[in-house]
Swiss-Prot record:
Location of this chain's protein in the cell: Cell membrane
Topology within the bilayer: Multi-pass membrane protein
TM regions (residue ranges): 7-29, 49-71, 91-113, 270-292, 299-316, 329-348
Source taxon at top rank: Bacteria
UniProt keyword Ribonucleoprotein present: no
InterPro entries from the UniProt entry: LptG/LptF_permease
Annotated protein name in UniProt: Uncharacterized protein aq_359
Coiled coil segments of this chain: none
Keyword annotations from UniProtKB, A to Z: Cell membrane, Membrane, Transmembrane, Transmembrane helix
GO CC, alphabetical: ATP-binding cassette (ABC) transporter complex
GO biological process, one term: lipopolysaccharide transport
Length: 356
């Protein structure tokens, strides 16, 4: 349809211009951060830093980029009264908006693929660069709810540090899960309820060990366990949960449930990534709904800003509740469910149309 191509080209033009400005701002921030904050200003470090931060910057500010693009695009459409002309031919607002909605679905699909294949690796690279080349990156204080992974030969080990005092090494709620790298079969799970971490060993005051190869479970009291990992290496050379792909998070979610580990952190991270990736669809539906219902920019903007704040809180809730507030991730499902219902209602209203 000729109108579809026209609307899509106009919207893409605005979106690309806004994205260019956004990436330019991210580049400026990265340049200033590199010049001021890095202790080593080598060309290879700068290039690696820019190549990792730019795509991540586009991903994280797409929330704002898409919102601005939609408002600018729809303002022009409604100023020209194009929606009235189209509706006079019996074309619904949903059909009229189809090019924009399909683009938002494409953007969400790209973000989901990025969370599986690209963004976690870029975050890990960025973390490593900052920890090694930025100023004042010494490890100190406390580590709480820290998740990471270490790969060695044929074994991959997932770690969770519940609470670690770096000054004396006192440790609470520490878990490790060893799995085979090829088929991800679990080999061993270590649970340390309380202990002391010194050098590359942990003195376990109270804990448990599950040996999957022998099918054996053993209580551990006042015993030293060789970990092969020092406290300094935890932050300098490890991977956090943010650096795991969607498939790895899903795997850990399943395995953690089977062996009795805290599954809420993985479930919350999975929901957060999926919801953030789907945010372009939610933003597009709601902005189209508001413009077709109210038509006047002065009435649309306040409602749109309120929606953006609510959407942001809903998206963050599955990540924050288990990781920061120690609350069940199920609490976040209620606002997510309501958001999905409200979005479906918006699609229905767009399909039905609004009285002029």
């Amino acid at each position: 349809m000729l109108l579809d191509r026209y609307l899509l080209s106009r919207f893409l033009g605005i979106f690309l211009n806004v994205s260019f400005v956004s990436v330019l701002l991210v580049s400026l921030y990265a340049l200033l951060d590199f010049l001021v904050g890095f202790k080593e200003k080598r060309t290879d470090v700068a290039l690696s830093y820019f190549l990792n931060i730019l795509p991540l910057g586009f991903y994280y500010i797409s929330f704002i980029t898409l919102s601005i693009s939609l408002i600018l695009f729809l303002r022009k459409v409604f100023e020209k009264k194009m929606e009235l002309t189209v509706q006079s031919f019996g074309i619904s607002p949903l059909r009229f908006s189809l090019p924009v909605l399909l683009f938002s679905v494409f953007l969400s699909s790209t973000f989901l693929l990025g969370n599986e294949y690209a963004f976690p690796k870029l975050l890990g690279n960025l973390w490593f660069i900052e920890k090694n080349y930025k100023k004042k990156q010494e490890v100190k204080g406390f580590i709480k709810n820290f998740w990471f992974i270490k790969k060695e030969n044929e074994v991959k080990t997932y770690y969770h540090v519940g609470n670690l005092n770096l000054s004396d090494g006192s440790l609470f709620n520490f878990y490790t899960m060893k799995v085979e790298r090829k088929n991800l079969n679990p080999l061993e799970v270590l649970k340390v309820f309380s202990g002391v971490w010194k050098d590359k060993e942990i003195f376990i005051r109270s804990g448990e060990i599950y040996d999957f190869e022998k099918g054996k479970r053993e209580k551990v009291f006042n015993k030293t366990f060789k970990l092969g990992l020092s406290i300094k290496e935890v932050e300098l050379f490890s991977e956090k949960i943010d650096f795991l792909s969607l498939s790895e998070i899903f795997f850990l979610m399943q395995k953690s449930k089977k062996v009795g580990l805290n599954v809420d952190v993985y479930t919350g991270e999975l929901f957060y990534r999926v919801m953030f990736s789907l945010s372009p669809v939610f933003i597009s539906i709601f902005s189209l709904y508001l413009f077709f219902k109210h038509k006047v920019l002065s009435q649309v903007i306040p409602r749109f800003l309120v929606f953006i704040v609510i959407l942001w809180l809903v998206i963050l809730s599955p990540k924050i509740l288990p990781q920061k507030a120690n609350q069940p991730v199920l609490y976040s499902l209620i606002p997510i469910f309501l958001l999905i219902l409200y979005s479906l209602k918006g699609v229905y209203d767009l399909r039905k149309g609004f009285r002029v």
